[in-house]
């Protein structure tokens, strides 16, 4: 959970942990993690808007380290997908094996304004370059990473 000013600060130094523990899988999440898809991200801004400048810390970590993944849950994951659709299409293609859908839905029916997950599913379906990539992000990557057996 990367959230500037609160949890796991110094995201720019996270690569040291990834190098030190190459056999441990890490799942990045939250406002600072997803804000840093943008190379010019201002760390104090929790939900940045507008076009993404390529080359952000998160993009580099996902590209360079096989033991890091990205959890798209909550408003921060949703914001990272919706703020620049052109960037998102390429990001989903580049990191199709490293991204994990998470609902962060805190209601019992799985819909409505409090359920960010329903909106995130819609964005993944809309912006994934292919059905294969969509399936990976929505469930196949998590199943593989967490070593879950498919249901019969």
Annotated model-derived regions:
Residues 96-100, 106-152:
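Mid-to-C-terminal alpha-helical segments outside catalytic/metal-binding sites
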Residues 1-101:
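Catalytic pocket-lining loop regions of alpha/beta-barrel enzymes
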